[in-house]
Amino acid sequence: MADVLERVTKIIVDRLGVDEADVKMEASFKEDLGADSLDVVELVMELEDEFDMEISDEDAEKIATVGDAVNYINSQQ
């Protein structure tokens, strides 16, 4: 799980320009990390590329926090 979290964190830091210390499992992309809807869509696309997976629109809508993303990726691998 640490490896997935590290990779997700790097993508978030690169995409949103936030401090790595702010990227916590419970952090909301929109409320805590300042992402807008387009940022979230782009994050999902980058996660798909990084982890070589397809995330359905229905599942993507459920990914609201860093922890949601990490748990989803772990459940699909």
From Swiss-Prot:
Boundaries of each Carrier domain copy? 2-77
Q: Does the keyword Cytoplasm apply?
A: yes
Q: Listed GO molecular functions?
A: acyl binding; acyl carrier activity
Biological-process GO terms, alphabetical: lipid A biosynthetic process
Q: Which residues carry this modification: O-(pantetheine 4'-phosphoryl)serine?
A: 37
- What are its GO cellular component terms? cytosol; membrane
Q: How is it modified after translation?
A: 4'-phosphopantetheine is transferred from CoA to a specific serine of apo-ACP by AcpS. This modification is essential for activity because fatty acids are bound in thioester linkage to the sulfhydryl of the prosthetic group.
Q: Which PROSITE patterns match?
A: CARRIER, PHOSPHOPANTETHEINE
For this protein, the record's Pfam families field holds: PP-binding
Its job:
Carrier of the growing fatty acid chain in fatty acid biosynthesis.
The record's similarity note reads: Belongs to the acyl carrier protein (ACP) family.
User: Could you tell me which HAMAP family the record lists for this protein?
Assistant: Acyl_carrier (MF_01217)
Q: Which NCBIfam families match?
A: acyl_carrier, PRK00982.1-2, PRK00982.1-3, PRK00982.1-4, PRK00982.1-5
Q: Give the protein name, as stated in the record.
A: Acyl carrier protein
Annotated gene:
acpP
